[in-house]
Each structure stands twice: as structure tokens, then as C-alpha cells.
Design a protein with these regions (language model features):
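Extramembrane terminal tails and long inter-domain/linker segments of multi-pass membrane proteins
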Residues: 1-22, 50-59, 136-145, 184-188, ...
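Interfacial and helix-entry/exit segments of alpha-helical transmembrane bundles
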Residues: 20-32, 102-117, 187-209, 275-290, ...
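Membrane-entry segments of alpha-helical transmembrane domains in multi-pass membrane proteins
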Residues: 20-34, 60-84, 102-109, 116, ...
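Divalent metal-coordination and catalytic microenvironments
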Residues: 21, 71, 97, 116, ...
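Gly/Pro-rich turn-and-neighbor structural signature
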Residues: 32, 112, 179, 186-244, ...
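Transmembrane-helix bundle segments that line or gate the permeation/cavity pathway
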Residues: 38-47, 75-94, 113-136, 160-181, ...
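Membrane-interface interhelical loops and short amphipathic "cap" helices
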Residues: 44-72, 100, 129-157, 216-248, ...
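Hydrophobic alpha-helical segments at protein termini of multi-pass membrane proteins
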Residues: 530-545, 552-562, 566-785
Length: 785
């Protein structure tokens, strides 16, 4: 194979088609660096605009709004979160003794969806009217087509849809990896802090992303199809804020928890002591911080007129949720006390992250007060607060991780003097940029200019100088990275920090075998043999196709057509690879501790897929719940609704629902025949299930045609908007199920579903029964209420 390609082409193929978790981690890393360069440039433009009062003017109001909106989206969603994902992809399998992540192709698919989604988002800068300018939170109705008619908002929405898909796949993948792929001896008690924090992060993503996925879908529907979810007063701002902040507040912890994990690893190594009260810390994060982050999101909505009693409840919960954060800082301090502290670059950034996290946290406690929030919400005090958390704590913590793990990544040491200079300049200029914001209590955070008479000029000038210095100081980090990845300088010993972390026992030059030696935690020293994970083009092809589809919806049919062809080709190729067993997933001859999922001696690959299927369905349930919540919210705020039977053909819909229910019965008969080894009968029932599922879609399509004939369209108020969104989603799920069922039926016809091997059919039945259940719930909720 190597002789068939030139070295350059072979290198390109390797990085486009890799499914190895280490290489995927590096792709995440360098892509996040590319995005932070864009976000940092936008920050520089914003600070330059605010350096002096009017008439100083280098950006128009529109250009400034674009810079602010895209800066926030890029930094939070395309830089900080993916940088944490880079560490998780690379090091979690190493830390738990796994060969790779649970689903290597989906891991690659998740990365390429992230990259393509990010490209779609920033492509608005090249579109007529510019990029999105409704703020990084995309508040409706400002983000609607009425107030933001340019394509920028649509491109952001479409790119976000790809990103939400990426995050969902990534969260399922990493959770399954940690739950079921730990090596023998790697018990929960021995799990490294970074892996614990990764698990908590992915659980947050699994259950928070579906809400904003549904909200973004409704927003795109408003902008492209003419629905009115966020233009009608029954939905509008409050509906969007609920859907956004149910994701947005947990996202804060999604950003900071990987940084905390890296900080904990650094503290252990450079103090020579284990984490103080590690068990209590992990319990507090898992049982307080993670669940409470969903219950306090509405503290971002204190000024929206929500019930006063509800505000007090949220205020109290917010203060309770500070306890794990305080405990984390105390545990890190206690870890350092009495330790043999080595002030290397990783430790300096870790300590800086903890210090600024305290400042950011205390400033945030003020905002949790209903009374103070009314005074501070729209000011630069809030900007200072969240930058101390997102830049100070999260970015500094992740930079500590970079300096700690860089020798592992590259096999090279770096200049400690340059790294320390990077720390000193970053810490000084960071505080110079953001600390003065705490004094700008009267400056609105969404203005692009101001008058000299306000007295804000000196503060803004200092902040701008600090921002320039902070941006320039990051070139020191870039220099260190480029030198290390180019293998310039001194080679690193296998374990330069003398760490006890399991990730340091593997070969840094190996992209296949994580553990060439015996894994130390295994009770009897055994470890399963390694399997080469081949290159696979399907994740890249499908992601590129989806990206072109998104761009084509805005820029023209040619891109749309090319995207559809590429996407269909990629999906077909993925199924063909599976039918011909062309891709091998990493397996395990022995599983480690399996609690809370009982193994029962089941085939490991089947067991792994089963856990992943249940996790995906849990996320999909949250998605459907968010859509149902949207319907309930609208109905509660819009009592004037068409009478039952006045618009919809109830008998037809009831019959169609029964058709889909019947398909579940035929599928169960197919499973029973598969268990008994009756291949011909099984294929017959699978075909019947296909026919019934297809009939459901045809009847649903007829219902849409009938409604359009009555002039009941997407824009027919909230009744039309909710009808087409909910029936469209159920139809999309059925269509996806039929694609999977076609693949399974083909396997059955080929004789690859047998009495001993029918796990794929049984796992598919979980999804199909879930879809049927959702349609059964949809029928009374949409048609009979």
C-alpha cells in the first residue's frame, strides 16, 4: 500500500482517513488552535474599536456585532470545548488501558463534523451581509429572518447543527469507552482525575445538547421554511432562552471540567502527592455540580419576568452549586501543602488557573443574587466574570495540560525558559485585560462605541493594551508547539516528569499499540493483543457531504447537489464496509470492572454496542422531550388553538399510527425467527417491516400534501409550525430507521444474521421501538389536545 502512494499523498490520506484516537486527538488540537487564531483576531479588532471613545471608529456597528457574535461562538464552541476533546481523545484510552475509543469511525466522524460545522459557521464572513451579528447566544427574535435577514445567522445555525451532532456522537463514544473498556484492574477507585472529569463532561453534553439541538432546528426552520416559533409572542425570546441556557449553563462546566482534570494531574505530579480527598471531590462534582448545572440555568434569565419564587429557588441552587467548586480549590491547595513542589511550566499555569478561578467564581456569586443581577447583568462586570472563568480558569488549565503532556505527544522536551516567559506575560496581560472590567459597572456590554464624557476611556485603553499583550504572548506557546512537533530540540525521556499516570507507560511514537508492555494494574499482568485499526474514508466523505449541503442551502444548488451525492456515497460505503467486514473495531479478550453494567459473559463487541445504543436513545429521549416541551410551552401561552378535528384528518392519522405499531410486531417476529435460526421466515418479516415503515412515510407525505392543499403551511401560525416540525422529526426518525433496516435486511438475505449472530437486529429493535413509542406519544399530544 505504501508503494502505491507518494509520501505526500500517503501523509494526506493518513490524516484525512485516520480512525486512531491519538491522531484524532491531534486533529482536534490543531483545529482548535486554528479556530482560536480566528477568535483571537476578532477579539483584537473588538478591543481596538473600544480603545478610544467616539469619534474613534475602525469598525461599523454591524462589523463590531459580527466580531462579538463570532468571537463568542468560536472561542466557546470551536476552541475551548474541542481543546478539551483533544486531550480526552488522546489520553483517556491510554489512562484506562484501552486500545482505542469504543467506536473509532464515529470518533473520526465526530471530528470531521466539528471541522465542517465550524467552516460553515465562519463562511458567513464571505457571504453578502456578513457573518452572524445577533450575539453569540443567538437570542430570538433578533436572530430571526425579520431582524437578521442576511445569510450569516442561517450559516451559524446550520454549522451549529453539525456541531451538535458531533458533540452527541463524541459524548456517547467517550462514555462507553470509560464505562466498558477499562483494562482489568482499572477500577473506578483507580480512575485518574482527568478521566473522571472527562466522564462528567460527556454526561453533561449527552443530556444538554439535545435541548439546543431542538432549539437550533426550530430557529433554522423559522429562517428557511417560514415557521414562526421565535416570531410569535407565544414562543419568541423566552422559548429560545430556555432551550439555549439548558445547554449553555452546563456548557460552562463542559469547558472547565477538562481543565480541572488536567490541573489535578499536574498537581499530583509536581507536588509529589495524591489529590487530597479525591473521592469526596469526585462525588461532589458527580452528584452536585453535574445535576445542579441543569437546575440553575435560569439564573441567566432573572430579568425575563420569571416567577419570583422560582428565582429564589434558582438563587439558592446556584449558591449550593458553588460548593464543589470551592471544594476543588481547597483540595488542590491541600494537595500542595507539604508537597515537594516543582515550579515547572505546567504547575505555574495550573496555580494561575486556580487563582483566577477564585476571582471569577466570587464575581459570579454576585450575579447569582436576583437584586445584584438586575444592576450588573448588562454591564462589563459580567464580561469580566465569565472571561475569568472561560479564559483564566479553563484556558490556563488546558495550557497546563499542554505543557504537561507535550513530551508525551511529541517525544520532545521544550524550553522551560520560553514556557515560563509565556506564563509570566500571559498572567500579567490577562489580568490587565479583564480585571479593569470589574470597575466598568455602568458600561453596557453590547455597545460598539461610547462618549468621552462617560469616563470609560482610560479603562478601555488599558484593557486594549492588555489584550494586545495577551495575544502576542500566545505566540510563545505557538513557538514551543511548532518546535516540539517538528522534533527540534532535546528528545524527551519516556517519563520526563516521573509521573505515575498510566498514560506514560505507552510508546509516544506508536499510533496503534497503546500498551506495548504489561499493564501494571492488571491483577495477573495480562492484556489483550492489539488490532490494527485501518484507515477509513467514510467519516470524512459523509461530513464533507453534509457541510456542502449546509453551504448549498445558502449559496446554491450546485453545492447542495454535490453534498447530497457525497453524503449518499459515504453512507452507502459505510454500510458496504460493514457488510464485507472491511473495518475492525478494537476488541478486548477480557473486560475490566463492569459495574454498573453487568457483562454476563456476552460478546464484548455486542455488549459495547448495547451500552452505546442505550446512551444514544437516552439523548434522543431528551431531544424529543425538548420538542414536546416546546409544544407544551406554546400551548400554555397560546390558548387560541384549532379545535380537535377541524384541521387534521384524525382517522387517517390514527390508522397511520397503527401501521407503524404493526411494524413493531413484525420486527419482533423477525427477531424470534432469527433466534430460532429460521432465516427465510426472518427475511419475510423484515421485508414486511420495511413495507409498513415505508407505508407510514407515504401516508405522512400524503397528509402533508393534503394540508398544503388547504393552505395550512409552515407559516400558518404556531399550529402549522408545531405540526410540521413534530411530524417532520418523527418522519426523519422513521426514514433513518428504514435505512438501517434496509442494511439489516440485506445482511439477512446474505445469510449473515444467524441463530448465534443476530445482535445487530436486536439492537436495531431498540431504536425502532423507541421511534414507535415517540409516534404514539405524538398522536394525542399534537392531534387531540
Amino acid at each position: 500500500m505504501k508503494e502505491a502512494y507518494s509520501p505526500t499523498l500517503a501523509w494526506i490520506r493518513k490524516w484525512l482517513f485516520t480512525t486512531d484516537h491519538k491522531e484524532i486527538g491531534l486533529l482536534y488540537f490543531w483545529t482548535s488552535i486554528w479556530f482560536v487564531a480566528i477568535g483571537g483576531a476578532l477579539a483584537g479588532l473588538m478591543r481596538t474599536q473600544l480603545a478610544f471613545p467616539a469619534p474613534w471608529d475602525i469598525l461599523s456597528a454591524s462589523a463590531y456585532n459580527q466580531a462579538v457574535s463570532m468571537h463568542g461562538l468560536i472561542m466557546v464552541l470551536l476552541f475551548l470545548s474541542p481543546l478539551g476533546a483533544a486531550f480526552s481523545n488522546y489520553f483517556v484510552p491510554l489512562q484506562i488501558g484501552a486500545k482505542d475509543v469504543a467506536y473509532p469511525r464515529f470518533n473520526a466522524f465526530s471530528y470531521w463534523m466539528y471541522l465542517m460545522g465550524g467552516i460553515v459557521m465562519i463562511s458567513g464572513f464571505f457571504a453578502p451581509g456578513g457573518a452572524a451579528q445577533a450575539g453569540w447566544t443567538n437570542y430570538a427574535p433578533l436572530s430571526s429572518i425579520t431582524f437578521s435577514p442576511g445569510p450569516g445567522e442561517s450559516l451559524v445555525g446550520l454549522g451549529l447543527m453539525m456541531l451538535w451532532g458531533s458533540l452527541t456522537m463524541g459524548s456517547v463514544n467517550l462514555i462507553v469507552t470509560i464505562l466498558v473498556m477499562r483494562a482489568p484492574g482499572m477500577t473506578w477507585k483507580k480512575l485518574p482525575p482527568f478521566t473522571w472529569m472527562t466522564l462528567f463532561t460527556q454526561l453533561l453534553l449527552l443530556f444538554s445538547v439535545p435541548s439546543i439541538f431542538a432549539g437550533t432546528l426550530a430557529l433554522i426552520s423559522d429562517r428557511t421554511l417560514g415557521t414562526v416559533f421565535f416570531l410569535n409572542p407565544a414562543g419568541s425570546t423566552i422559548l429560545w432562552e430556555n432551550m439555549w441556557w439548558f445547554f449553555g449553563h452546563p456548557e460552562v462546566y463542559v469547558v472547565v471540567l477538562p481543565a480541572f482534570g488536567a490541573i489535578a494531574e499536574v498537581m499530583m505530579v509536581f507536588t509529589g502527592r495524591p489529590i487530597y480527598a479525591k473521592k469526596a471531590l469526585m462525588i461532589s462534582v458527580g452528584l452536585i455540580m453535574v445535576p445542579f448545572s441543569f437546575s440553575i440555568y435560569a439564573h441567566h434569565m432573572f430579568l425575563t419576568g420569571i416567577n419570583p419564587l422560582q428565582r429564589e429557588f434558582i438563587d439558592l441552587n446556584t449558591e449550593i452549586n458553588t460548593l464543589p467548586s470551592g471544594l476543588l480549590v481547597i483540595c488542590m491547595i491541600a494537595t500542595a501543602i507539604g508537597g515537594a513542589i516543582k515550579f515547572k511550566a505546567p504547575l505555574t499555569f495550573a496555580l494561575a488557573a486556580l487563582a483566577v478561578f477564585v476571582i471569577g467564581g466570587i464575581s459570579g456569586v454576585f450575579d447569582s443574587s436576583v437584586l445584584l443581577d438586575q444592576e450588573l447583568r448588562g454591564t462589563y462586570q459580567v464580561v469580566g466574570h465569565f472571561h475569568y472563568i472561560m479564559v483564566g480558569a479553563a484556558e490556563f488549565g488546558l495550557i497546563a495540560g499542554i505543557y504537561y503532556w507535550l513530551p508525551k505527544w511529541t517525544g520532545m522536551m521544550y524550553s522551560g525558559a520560553v514556557a515560563k516567559l509565556h506564563f509570566i506575560t500571559s498572567f500579567i496581560f490577562f489580568n490587565m485585560t479583564f480585571f479593569p472590567m470589574f470597575y466598568l459597572l455602568e458600561m453596557p456590554r453590547r455597545v460598539y462605541t461610547y462618549l468621552a464624557s462617560t469616563g470609560w476611556g482610560s479603562y478601555n485603553f488599558i484593557e486594549t493594551l492588555g489584550a494586545y499583550g495577551f495575544i502576542i504572548s500566545q505566540f510563545l506557546l505557538l513557538y514551543v508547539l511548532v518546535e516540539a512537533f517538528r522534533h527540534k530540540g532535546q528528545p524527551a525521556p519516556p517519563n520526563p516528569w516521573k509521573s505515575a499516570g498510566p498514560e506514560w507507560t505507552s510508546d509516544p511514537k506508536s499510533y496503534v499499540d497503546n500498551y506495548p508492555a504489561v499493564y501494571a494494574s492488571a491483577p495477573s499482568g495480562e492484556h489483550a493483543p492489539h488490532v490494527m485499526t485501518p484507515l477509513n474514508s467514510r467519516p470524512f466523505t459523509i461530513s464533507l457531504g453534509l457541510g456542502l449541503i449546509c453551504l448549498g442551502l445558502i449559496f446554491g444548488w450546485a453545492l447542495l447537489g454535490a453534498g447530497l451525492i457525497l453524503g449518499a456515497y459515504g453512507i452507502y460505503g459505510w454500510a458496504k464496509d460493514d457488510l464485507n467486514s472491511k473495518f475492525s473495531m478494537p476488541g478486548e479478550e477480557k473486560a475490566g470492572e463492569t459495574w454498573p453494567f453487568k457483562h454476563d459473559g456476552e460478546n464484548f463487541g455486542v455488549w459495547r454496542m448495547k451500552v452505546g445504543t442505550w446512551l444514544f436513545l437516552a439523548s434522543d429521549l431528551v431531544f424529543f422531550s425538548a420538542v414536546a416541551g416546546l409544544l407544551l410551552f406554546v400551548r400554555l401561552h397560546l390558548p387560541d388553538w384549532p379545535a380537535v378535528g377541524s384541521v387534521f384528518d384524525i382517522p387517517l392519522v390514527a390508522f397511520n399510527t397503527l401501521v407503524l405499531i404493526t411494524s413493531g410486531l413484525t420486527l419482533m417476529l423477525a427477531i424470534q425467527d432469527a433466534k430460532e435460526g429460521k432465516a427465510a421466515s426472518m427475511t419475510k418479516w423484515l421485508t414486511a417491516t420495511l413495507v409498513l415503515g415505508g407505508s407510514f412515510l407515504i401516508i405522512s407525505g400524503f397528509e402533508w400534501v393534503e394540508q398544503f392543499a388547504k393552505n395550512f403551511t409552515f407559516s400558518s401560525g404556531m399550529p402549522g409550525s408545531t405540526f410540521y416540525l413534530m411530524t417532520g422529526l418523527s418522519g426523519a426518525h422513521v426514514f433513518a430507521g428504514l435505512l438501517m433496516l434496509t442494511y439489516i435486511t440485506k445482511k439477512g438475505i446474505s445469510g449473515k444474521i444467524t441463530k448465534e449472530n443476530n445482535s445487530g437486529l436486536r439492537l436495531f429493535s431498540l431504536f425502532w421501538m423507541f421511534v414507535i413509542a415517540m409516534v404514539v406519544v405524538l398522536f394525542p399530544a399534537l392531534y387531540l389536545m
